[in-house]
């Protein structure tokens, strides 16, 4: 593990695998350092998009506890600090045209992308959603702690763009 809690009872863990009070105490400095390492990227994304940085940080804390690795079970796959799903990818591609117009030509032919996400066939939409969700997957079997942080800035910017897309969709529905 990342934290050495061998001098704690049961190595710092309860029977269910959760940290015991001693394990929590040992982990606190590492946890604080881990979650605060993303502050500059969050601030940069906030400045670029006008999405409040505190909102993003609180959502990251709730959704992923600042762990950008994949969370997968039989029903759903979530990636990145914001836990992007295929439905979340669909939302940002459909409701944030500025983001779509930058991302789509990285995956599909520019001529295929020119009319917008809703005009793509189902196969091309699925390819874009898959490429987008996997682009924020930080899992790496050969990296320290199993996480590759080299793409974290894109993951954070994408999350801000996804929040903008959700606002756009909500505004459409309310009006």
Which residue stretches match the model-derived regions?
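Cell-wall glycan-active module
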Residues: 1-175
